[in-house]
Each structure stands twice: as structure tokens, then as C-alpha cells.
A protein has these predicted regions:
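A secondary-structure micro-motif
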Residues: 2-6, 10-190
């Protein structure tokens, strides 16, 4: 019985490792697909800011690899942010949750436009027309802009704020990817 129990534990551990490898492979192949489709530059995240600093990361590709300022950055699942500074070997990417981030945004279901801005932990979309019948769960994607192609997932609506005195409404999004767990990204030229 003890040997069977030990063997079972080893098989469970091996199964867990295989699931992790399968997930990593799936993510990597998805990243290759994004890079190929947009002729993007694959990069690794090599630096995160200290707590309570700006919401930016450092990637391991710079001007020598073809990265330029204002290019969009994606990961499997959606928008990461935008390149704001480029060195020869690395670049700084401001995340969509940073206060300085502004992206043209569209609610996919009804094509209602707004501006997505960072709010440190989430993304807020302002200036959506007041009578748009928004719903929690609506997906918001990029509109046509300087840094991004249109139709890329930004996040999902988790809260709707309808202003009485304004002609627009605001929604709060949960970003489409876990920005705290970034590893590999693709810089996408526009």
C-alpha cells in the first residue's frame, strides 16, 4: 500500500509538470502566432518597477532589434501597453493600467467608442455615449490609434458608472491579461 501511495504521488507530480509544460508551449506558440501575424518583435520582460511606482516594465529588446517608441505591446490574450523609451538593448513599456496610458477603445458588442485610461489596478473607459446599453461582461477592444491596430482585447467590463450631469458614461475594465505575471511579449509595429 505504501509503494502504491508513493507511486501515485510521483504520478500526480509528473502530471502537474506536464500540465505546466503544455501551458507554456501553448503560450509560446500563441506568441509566435502574434509575432508572425503582425511582423512583431518577441521580447522578454526583464524588469518590474518597485511597489507604488509607475506601471511600467522593461523588456530585453531595443533599437538594435528594431523597437521604436510608441509601438504597441501585446501578450497572448491582449494589450500590454506601449513603448515609451528605447535604448540599444532594452525598452520601457508603460502598461495599460498606468495613469499616463490613453488608448482609443471600442465596446465590441455595440461599437461604442471611448478612451481607455489606466487606473493603476484596472482600466477605465470614459466618454462612452450616455444611451449605449452597456452590460457587465462586455469586451472592450482597441480602436484605430497611433500605437495599436484595431480590435485587440483591452479588457472586460466589470462596472458601469452612468453620470447624471454628463452626456457620457464610464466603465471599469478588468484587463484581458494578468499584467503582474508578464513574461514574454510582442512589440507590434503600426
Amino acid at each position: 500500500v505504501a509503494r502504491l501511495r508513493a507511486r501515485n504521488e510521483r504520478l500526480v507530480e509528473e502530471n502537474d509538470r506536464l500540465h505546466e509544460l503544455a501551458s507554456a508551449y501553448k503560450a509560446q506558440s500563441g506568441l509566435h502566432s502574434i509575432a508572425g501575424f503582425y511582423r512583431g518583435i518577441e521580447a522578454r520582460v526583464i524588469g518590474f518597477p518597485p511597489e507604488n511606482e509607475s506601471r511600467a516594465v522593461t523588456i530585453d529588446k531595443g533599437s538594435l532589434a528594431g523597437v521604436r517608441a510608441d509601438e504597441g505591446v501585446l501578450a497572448v490574450g491582449g494589450v500590454v501597453g506601449r513603448v515609451v523609451a528605447v535604448g540599444p538593448l532594452s525598452s520601457t513599456v508603460v502598461l495599460v493600467t498606468d495613469y499616463t496610458s490613453r488608448i482609443p477603445a471600442v465596446v465590441r458588442r455595440g461599437r461604442w467608442w471611448g478612451i481607455a485610461r489606466g487606473n493603476l489596478t484596472s482600466v477605465v473607459v470614459d466618454y462612452i455615449e450616455q444611451d449605449a446599453p452597456l452590460q457587465v461582461g462586455d469586451v472592450v477592444v482597441t480602436g484605430e490609434g497611433r500605437s495599436f491596430h484595431s480590435g485587440l482585447p483591452i479588457g472586460t467590463v466589470i462596472q458601469i458608472e452612468r453620470g447624471n450631469a454628463t452626456l457620457s458614461q464610464t466603465v471599469v475594465l478588468r484587463p484581458s491579461i494578468d499584467l503582474g505575471a508578464l513574461d514574454r511579449v510582442v512589440v507590434v509595429p503600426k
